[in-house]
Amino acid sequence: KLDLSFVPSIEYAKNTDYLIVNNISISSLGTVNTVLLTSKTKMEDIKTVAADNRSLSSIVLLKILFKEKFNRLPLFNYTEPDYEKMLSSNDAALIIGDNTFSFERTGKTIYDLSREWFQLTGKPFVHALLCVRNKVQVDQNIIKTILKSRDEGLASIEQISKDEARTLGITKEKCADYLKYKIRYTLGNAEQEGLKEFFSLAFSHGFIKSKPKLNFIGDDN
């Protein structure tokens, strides 16, 4: 087991043993382009969804959107992230991460879940948090190094985009746009409010057993 790691935000809500490292997250405000529901039909008509089994927070987010918008849930089928197989026997597929850059979109209806969340709440969506296990003593220099690495990465986005674009098979410009303008890397007041709203709705719809407080390293817990 790791003592310090990024975890899906919903994982924090389900585990009372975690503390949050402040001022860092993987978040988005509006369109993100890498958490997508692709469908053969309109969202309100979807009856079955194939969900990438790695996408814990995204699955709960999608369920919240269905409950809030239509007061119902389709049937979720959990599977490996094979886009063609996912859509072959389901009305829609939840696709996340690098797979969203390459799948065929022609003739499909695409819903960006981060944009749908923003339209629903007006708040950012926090996809992942940097967490440490409670009672584990983490050297503050390690956290400072992580935050410094984040800042150095942001200062080097052009080169990172060039390298990653080649790996992903997309243009450097598309990669840079994603890293610069689609992803947010902090955990400020706006992100914390979005996280609280996510947990509140997840709890009210029965997707988590309790609504967690945001407990940070250094707080008196």
Label each PLM-derived region with a short phrase.
Residues 32-91, 193, 199:
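Bilobed "Venus flytrap"/periplasmic-binding protein-like clamshell domains
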Residues 6, 78-164:
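Pocket-lining segment of extracytoplasmic ligand-binding domains
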Residues 19, 74-75, 109:
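Conserved beta-strand segments of alpha/beta enzyme cores
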Residues 73-79, 169-180, 209-214:
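Short, surface-exposed acidic
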Residues 138-201, 205:
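Secondary-structure end/capping motifs
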Residues 7, 23, 77-81, 217-219:
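Conserved beta-strand termini and adjacent loop/short-helix elements that scaffold enzyme active sites
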Residues 204-221:
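Long, low-complexity C-terminal extensions of enzymes
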Residues 1-45, 53-54, 58:
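Short, glycine-/small- and polar/acidic-enriched structural segments
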